[in-house]
């Protein structure tokens, strides 16, 4: 504690024996021991109070964080979620604003009105021509990946009894991968 070695303790003992004397030395040592005991008790009491304050502060922090979590979790109760969902559905089903006729709009802006002489250009695009449609399909088909499928080899089929020609077997070549 005070970093006193044996040699220093021996020097202190010899000085105390010479200064105090052998008759009163046991009483003085007892009194010094009591003071040391009181100092240790005070130090341990202070340390205990300090640790208690730290635990209380830590518990207050934990309680605060627990209260925050509890408050946040209270909004997630099934009844609370159902009531919020019910409110959303009620708002979606509210048709009072839909039934009212639209109010007439009065044009107060100083925008120039198109004259009758000005030809109006259509805003919708023309339908695609057959040539452009085929080109568009070909362009789209080039960009898509193809799946590799093996061709089905025709199996020998029995000849019909009436002498008709057999039907052409189906062949699968390239199929679009999708």
Swiss-Prot record:
Keyword field: Cell inner membrane, Cell membrane, Membrane, Protein transport, Translocation, Transmembrane, Transmembrane helix, Transport
Gene that specifies this protein: tatB
Signal peptide: none
GO cellular component: TAT protein transport complex
Region of interest: Disordered: 146-178
Bias type Basic and acidic residues, positions: 168-178
Localisation per UniProt entry: Cell inner membrane
Name this polypeptide is given: Sec-independent protein translocase protein TatB
InterPro entries assigned: TatB (IPR018448)
Family note: Belongs to the TatB family.
Membrane topology term: Single-pass membrane protein
Complexes and interactors: The Tat system comprises two distinct complexes: a TatABC complex, containing multiple copies of TatA, TatB and TatC subunits, and a separate TatA complex, containing only TatA subunits. Substrates initially bind to the TatABC complex, which probably triggers association of the separate TatA complex to form the active translocon.
Transmembrane segments: 1-21
GO process annotations (BP): protein transport by the Tat complex
Organism: Bradyrhizobium sp. (strain ORS 278)
UniProt cross-references to PANTHER family, sorted A to Z: SEC-INDEPENDENT PROTEIN TRANSLOCASE PROTEIN TATA, CHLOROPLASTIC
Keyword Transport applies: yes
Keyword Signal: no
GO function term, MF aspect, one: protein transmembrane transporter activity
Free-text function comment from the UniProt entry: Part of the twin-arginine translocation (Tat) system that transports large folded proteins containing a characteristic twin-arginine motif in their signal peptide across membranes. Together with TatC, TatB is part of a receptor directly interacting with Tat signal peptides. TatB may form an oligomeric binding site that transiently accommodates folded Tat precursor proteins before their translocation.
């Amino acid at each position: 504690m005070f970093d006193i070695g044996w040699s220093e303790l021996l020097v202190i003992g010899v000085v105390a024996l010479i200064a105090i004397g052998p008759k009163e030395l046991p009483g003085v040592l007892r009194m010094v021991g009591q003071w040391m005991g009181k100092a240790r008790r005070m130090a341990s009491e202070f340390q205990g109070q300090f640790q208690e304050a730290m635990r209380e502060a830590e518990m207050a922090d934990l309680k605060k964080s627990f209260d925050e979590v509890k408050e946040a979790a209270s909004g997630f109760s099934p009844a609370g979620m159902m009531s919020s969902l019910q409110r959303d559905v009620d708002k979606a089903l509210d048709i009072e604003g839909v039934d009212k006729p639209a109010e007439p709009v009065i044009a107060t802006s100083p925008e120039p009105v198109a004259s009758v002489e000005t030809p109006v250009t259509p805003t919708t695009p023309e339908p695609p021509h057959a040539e452009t449609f085929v080109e568009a399909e070909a362009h789209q088909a080039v960009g898509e990946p193809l799946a590799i499928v093996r061709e089905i080899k025709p199996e020998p089929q029995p000849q019909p009894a009436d002498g008709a020609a057999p039907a052409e077997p189906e062949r699968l070549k390239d199929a679009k991968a999708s």
